[in-house]
């Protein structure tokens, strides 16, 4: 009986940990989507195609383009943090973790053709 109780406790704990992890991942994805909408979508578009009026004027690349997709996460993170050409720097207004989350979100947008 004691072994069964201990096994159930372990299973319950595993479920709690799994649910907590999924919840955190969902929050991170929602936060990244909100950040992208607030900081990036005006130029890059909601879908990362760069086809907004501003994006067209600046000649922004589609996130699914080979040029963007071949960039490493470190390169994308650096561009978000430091800016590039007409793109502003976000290292003073975003936390490193937020920049990392944006990189993952942009990578995900780019994988959707």
Regions found by a protein language model. Give the residues of each.
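Post-cleavage N-terminal segment of exported redox proteins
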Residues: 1-28, 108-113
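Electrostatic cytochrome c docking/interface patches
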Residues: 19-35, 51, 66
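Soluble non-cytosolic domains of exported or imported proteins
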Residues: 30, 70, 93-97
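Periplasmic/extracellular electron-transfer cofactor-ligation site
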Residues: 33-59, 84-86, 108-113
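Gly/Gly-Pro-rich "capping" loops immediately C-terminal to redox-active cysteine motifs
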Residues: 49-78
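Residue-level detector of conserved, well-ordered beta-strand and adjacent loop positions
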Residues: 64, 88-91
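C-terminal capping alpha-helices of c-type cytochrome domains
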Residues: 79-80, 91-113
């Amino acid at each position: 009986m004691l072994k069964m109780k201990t096994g159930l406790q372990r299973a319950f704990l595993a479920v709690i940990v799994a649910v907590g992890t999924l919840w955190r991942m969902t929050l991170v994805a929602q936060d990244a989507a909100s950040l992208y909408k607030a900081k990036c979508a005006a130029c890059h578009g909601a879908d990362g195609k760069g086809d907004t009026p501003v994006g067209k004027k600046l000649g922004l690349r589609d996130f699914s383009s080979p040029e963007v997709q071949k960039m490493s996460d470190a390169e994308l993170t650096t561009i978000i943090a430091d800016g590039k050409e007409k793109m502003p720097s976000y290292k003073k207004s975003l936390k490193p973790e937020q920049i990392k989350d944006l990189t993952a979100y942009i990578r995900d947008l780019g994988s959707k053709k």
